[in-house]
Amino acid sequence: MAFGVYKVPEEQKTYAQMTPQEQAEEGAKKMVELMQSCPGKTVMAGVSGFFLGGFFGLFMASMSYDVPIGTNAVSNIRDLPFKQQMKLQFSDMGKRTYSSAKNFGYIGMVYSGVECAIESLRAKHDIYNGVSAGCITGGGLAIRAGPQAALVGCAGFAAFSTAIDLYLRSDSASPPKNDYDE
């Protein structure tokens, strides 16, 4: 029953009382709420960063022409049998992939958590959240190396975050009249 613009809220149905379509809509609504929460964003950034870092690490390890990490005792890897060479290469590739995945996941998780916390505290969604989160993340990750490294980390992460945010927000600009006017 509606009175003007105000609509009286309906009673909440249990899942047993809902149709399959209503159950699907309710499940999708709960999933969106979870993904938009700070813990959800933080976990998703960590997992996404882990997989992206894994692919990046695998690619970089496959392009590496130097001696594998754990083979300092081997004077010349070419002197080993082919099977042993392959074993060392794949072992090294796995270590590099996991290391890169772990680092990307950690950085993504920390940055996303800090940005979400800042956005919640400020109650605004603007570029300053990303800049501040970049500075805090970069400084926090480099603090063990000293205050100068923390300052450089802060500036570097803030600049990178600003560049990415500006690029992602550039879609709101009007498109060029033709391909030559940019």
Curated annotation (Swiss-Prot):
Biological process according to GO: protein insertion into mitochondrial inner membrane
Listed Pfam families: Tim17
Record keywords: Disulfide bond, Membrane, Mitochondrion, Mitochondrion inner membrane, Protein transport, Translocation, Transmembrane, Transmembrane helix, Transport
Keyword Membrane part of the UniProt annotation: yes
Topology class, membrane: Multi-pass membrane protein
Phylogenetic classification of the source organism: Eukaryota, Fungi, Dikarya, Ascomycota, Saccharomycotina
Subcellular location: Mitochondrion inner membrane
Record's keyword annotation contains Mitochondrion: yes
Highest taxon, organism lineage: Eukaryota
Function: Essential core component of the TIM22 complex, a complex that mediates the import and insertion of multi-pass transmembrane proteins into the mitochondrial inner membrane. In the TIM22 complex, it constitutes the voltage-activated and signal-gated channel. Forms a twin-pore translocase that uses the membrane potential as external driving force in 2 voltage-dependent steps.
Residues annotated as transmembrane: 43-63, 127-143, 148-168
Gene Ontology molecular function, alphabetical: mitochondrion targeting sequence binding; protein transmembrane transporter activity; structural molecule activity
Gene it is expressed from: TIM22
Protein name (Swiss-Prot/TrEMBL): Mitochondrial import inner membrane translocase subunit TIM22
Subunit structure: Component of the TIM22 complex, whose core is composed of TIM22 and TIM54, associated with the 70 kDa heterohexamer composed of TIM9 and TIM10 (or TIM8 and TIM13).
Organism: Debaryomyces hansenii (strain ATCC 36239 / CBS 767 / BCRC 21394 / JCM 1990 / NBRC 0083 / IGC 2968)
